[in-house]
């Protein structure tokens, strides 16, 4: 029997390719955002007539510099809007719609699909069992115009998740654990296939976080093999029925087991995603700003745990909270989470990447320390190159905002 990745490629190609093969694939979905869209469309213009192979398979979102903080950003968005209108693209999400990867996960991604987008965190859609990969602007332009593009078939690697999350531990800690175990390039050339022993103990939001940060692990893709949680998510979110195929017995290059019960809240310290430490090792470090959000940890359960902790008082560090999409924001408002966050002193806004890339809405200054739920912490990522960035789960982030120092959240849960 094939592995999940092999199964997807077999369906696409009509034959079973081997790892390392260069193949042409017809994507089920292609996406770009405001920061990469200009380059994608520029390449399309250079190829001749600006056209797409299938308007219904294209998703565009303004998320990185939205609302535009500079005149140049506004100019780029005007340019992209003009092309979106001319092409008649129906799946366009303007300012406030949310982050591209969250929108794809919420509304479009399906198991067994191949998804390409002009952003490195396209892997997020692997949470539902799609083979999702970020590509450069030239390759995305080719996929849009020709309806196909090339890739190198990755080597399957198995990760088995057993047990249940202890208090204060989330999907982010699984991602950081893997980074600590394998390093920032440990899965280069691999498609990581994750099976979950107790599916209901590992919700979709946490799966999305792990899939998202597989980029930092160097993985070509990370896919959660569909199970009952996948089926329930697709039905509840979109009213879509899905029955996973019966696979098993595939051959993997290697395998690794994550025991959830042995994990604790983790932190990636400056200036590398694989500089992973237990929260106790960095507890007490003063923090100037906390960011809760991004395509990594801006989903509803992330906002929920932050609100649960921030009910305990007002923040002592600047706190910015950004739900990853309009739908998440709206639901967080309905459930009272936004009210809790604002009363605690957090600044809350619609879905935007904002401070994650040091673009706007919370850029770090010289010498400042930032703790964020996003996915990267190299020098200058959140702003000034002399700032320091720590990565952690939303519970650690909320507890840190509450005390003004890096804090173990378990005392508040």
Curated annotation (Swiss-Prot):
Residues bound to [4Fe-4S] cluster: 295, 353, 356
Domain of life of the source: Archaea
Keyword Metal-binding attached: yes
InterPro entries linked to this entry: Acnase/IPM_dHydase_lsu_aba_1/3, Acoase/IPM_deHydtase_lsu_aba, Aconitase_4Fe-4S_BS, Aconitase_4Fe-4S_dom, HAcnase/IPMdehydase_lsu_prok, Homoacnase/IPMdehydase_lsu, IPM_dehydratase_rel_enz
Keywords in alphabetical order: 4Fe-4S, Amino-acid biosynthesis, Branched-chain amino acid biosynthesis, Iron, Iron-sulfur, Leucine biosynthesis, Lyase, Metal-binding
Group of enzyme by EC: lyase
Catalyzed reactions per annotation: (2R,3S)-3-isopropylmalate = (2S)-2-isopropylmalate
Pathway: Amino-acid biosynthesis; L-leucine biosynthesis; L-leucine from 3-methyl-2-oxobutanoate: step 2/4
GO molecular function: 3-isopropylmalate dehydratase activity; 4 iron, 4 sulfur cluster binding; metal ion binding
Membrane spanning stretches: none
Annotated GO biological process: L-leucine biosynthetic process
Record text on cofactor binding: Binds 1 [4Fe-4S] cluster per subunit.
Cofactor: [4Fe-4S] cluster
Function field: Catalyzes the isomerization between 2-isopropylmalate and 3-isopropylmalate, via the formation of 2-isopropylmaleate.
Subunit and partners: Heterodimer of LeuC and LeuD.
HAMAP family given in the database record: LeuC_type2
Entry-linked PANTHER family: HOMOACONITASE, MITOCHONDRIAL, HOMOACONITASE, MITOCHONDRIAL-RELATED
Entry protein name: 3-isopropylmalate dehydratase large subunit
Organism encoding this protein: Pyrobaculum calidifontis (strain DSM 21063 / JCM 11548 / VA1)
């Amino acid at each position: 029997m094939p592995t999940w990745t092999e199964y997807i490629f077999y369906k696409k190609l009509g034959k079973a390719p081997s790892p390392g093969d260069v193949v042409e694939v017809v994507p089920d979905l292609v996406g770009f955002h405001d920061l990469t869209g200009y380059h994608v469309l520029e390449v399309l213009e250079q190829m001749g007539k600006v056209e797409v192979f299938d308007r219904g398979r294209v998703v565009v979102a303004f998320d990185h510099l939205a609302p535009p903080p500079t005149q140049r950003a506004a100019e780029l968005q005007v340019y992209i809007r003009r092309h979106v209108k001319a092409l008649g693209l129906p799946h366009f999400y303007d300012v406030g719609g949310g982050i591209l990867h969250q929108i794809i996960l919420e509304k479009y991604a399906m198991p067994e699909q191949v998804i390409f987008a002009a952003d490195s965190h396209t892997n997020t859609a692997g949470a539902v069992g799609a083979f999702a990969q970020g590509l450069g602007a030239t390759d995305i332009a080719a996929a849009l115009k020709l309806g196909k593009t090339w890739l190198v078939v990755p080597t399957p690697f198995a990760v088995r998740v057993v047990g249940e999350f202890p208090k204060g531990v989330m999907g982010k800690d699984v991602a950081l654990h893997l980074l600590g175990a394998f390093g920032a390039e440990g899965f280069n050339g691999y498609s990581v296939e994750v099976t979950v022993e107790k599916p209901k103990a590992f919700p979709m939001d946490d799966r999305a976080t792990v899939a998202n940060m597989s980029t930092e692990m160097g993985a070509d893709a990370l896919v959660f093999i569909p199970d009952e949680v996948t089926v329930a998510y697709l039905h509840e979110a979109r009213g879509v029925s899905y029955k996973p195929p019966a696979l098993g017995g595939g051959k993997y290059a290697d395998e690794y087991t994550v025991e959830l019960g042995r994990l604790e809240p983790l932190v990636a310290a400056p200036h590398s995603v694989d500089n992973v430490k237990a929260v106790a090792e960095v507890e007490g470090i003063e923090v100037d700003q906390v960011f809760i959000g991004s395509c990594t940890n801006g989903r509803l359960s992330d906002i929920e745990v932050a609100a649960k902790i921030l009910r305990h008082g007002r923040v002592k560090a600047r706190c910015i909270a950004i739900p990853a999409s309009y739908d998440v924001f709206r639901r967080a408002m309905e459930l009272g989470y936004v009210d809790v966050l604002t009363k605690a002193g957090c600044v809350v806004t619609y879905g935007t990447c904002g401070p994650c890339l040091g673009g706007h809405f919370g850029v770090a200054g010289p010498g400042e320390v930032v703790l964020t739920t996003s996915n990267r912490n190299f020098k200058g990522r959140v702003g000034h190159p002399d700032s320091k960035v720590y990565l952690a789960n939303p519970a650690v982030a909320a507890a840190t905002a509450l005390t003004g120092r890096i804090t173990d959240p378990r005392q508040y849960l």
